[in-house]
Amino acid sequence: MIESSAEHNTRLTRTWIYLALLIFIVGLTIFPFLGLQDFNTKGEPREAVVASTMLETGNWILPRNNGGETAYKPPMLHWCVATLSAPLGKVSEYTARIPSAAAATVLALMTFLFFAKRSDVQLGFWASLIFLTTFEVHRAAATCRVDMLLTLFIVGALFQLYQWYERDMKGVPLLAILFMSAGMLAKGPVAVFLPCFVTFIFLWIQSTEVLWRIVLRLMGVALLALLLPAIWYYAAYLQGGESFLQLVYEENVLRFLGKMTYASHENGWYYYFPILAAGLLPYTLTLLFSIFGRPRNGAKYKPVVKINFVRRITEGLRSMNSVELFSFLSILLIFIFYCIPKSKRSVYILPIYPFLSFYIAKLFAYLRNEKPFALRVTGALLAAIAFIVPFGVLAVCEGWIKPSIFHGKHAVENAFLMQNLAAMDFGFLRLLFIIAPIIAAVYYLFHFRDRFRIVQAIFILVFGLYISLEGLFLPLILNPRSDKNVAVRLEQISHQTQHPVYAYVHSTDANNPLHFFTINFYMRNRLHAFDGKQAEGQIIVGEEDLKQLEAQYPAFVFIQKEDLHHRSCDVGQNIGLYTFARKAADAQL
């Protein structure tokens, strides 16, 4: 149906309003909180150290850290982090996480524009908000990892290839090629293969051209996408030689075939089903509640998922409109692809989230008109959480809940967390973070009966909870687990003694060695790997690894200098600082 001029102008105005609102929401709920959490897992500092090494050495091709290792992934993330950090002269938690946050923001805007143009402006807006507020996306958007960047490049390429299809595949899809090139520089050939594979199946089902022409066109696109990355791969080969080629082969081919020389996130074929249910929270609740109840019109109930999903599959994929078909194929094919390798992580399937968000938005539109019960129950549960959490904080601060309730190996950490919470200085911002979910819950209670505002009220609830979580609770919970304070102490000791600090971590796999990544980052890449060539010095080691260290290096004497009273977030052991020296007989030799 052709829009009138007035309808077009109205649609354009709504698009700009929603776009501005989306930018405002992201600016309020993601970027202000990026630097509040210290690095507390080995994944983030491992990537950040590579960017630090780039700034320190000037080697932006294949830098090596103090441990003598090169990065396991191509350098796109490290380039972004190093570029953003260069004006400050160092990499911080905030600058390290900006690329992921920016990628999530750009992808949310692209998701909105893509679906708003091809379905409904409000539906596109809902899809973008759902995408941003799913648990998995929100978490990935605030971490220094490559996965959100890769997701942007894969989904961006898919969107651009669809637009190429709309143009009858005339010309060269330059933006799609650039997205795939950037994706290959982020993680490898998967960023080229997946967009081309999904588009091939889509075009084949649509029967837009004969099969061989589709294959040739997409092969040409893929080859063009390989040109820019080939420059870096060649330059990296000149520096890394055969070991670099072996790393590329292992990380891409052997990982997919499940024949890596070391175990890497190995899980069964069913792994992604529960992981997806968890990653889609809180909207998994809505999907669950939509099964129950009857439509408003009193018709015999049919499962909601049949509205635009199962029924259309049974009637034939070709009966779907092209946007729905393309979205469905993107979900199905990417999901199946990542189920094949043994190596599986929740973030691998992030590229299906924008398309799932579109279907969830369509479900919301149906539920709002026909089954608001499902939305109201979802909102009621979220509102209950929004009320309970602040009162839980009050109970801890008033001493109604005692640290003695905790038992097990994390009892000390949890008790320390409660003590921090009880002793916390409640300034204006922290009070705001605590009451934000209450304000959102009150708004929901005033509007939950209004079926035209209930979806809006649910989004406000979710954002209120995330603001409280990111602004207050996650830093409070996770920062005590970070190795940052240990790194500060080791820096002091190194400065006082005028000697470097060495580190030892026992690893059963030489191809995937563990390190104190977090300590090394906060020591500005000045933590040296112990290899037995040193005559004397000081070394940090986990209490369980100490026996392995003594057995591996019998020519040395290790004496504890200081118990650091901390369980490392990288190696999961209590760590201590030791002095070491060669035994007299060995020293004479």
Which stretches of residues belong to each language-model region?
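Membrane-integral, polyisoprenol-dependent glycosyltransferases
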Residues: 1-374, 397, 559-561, 568-576, ...
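Membrane-embedded architecture of ER/inner-membrane glycosylation machinery
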Residues: 2-12, 174, 293-589
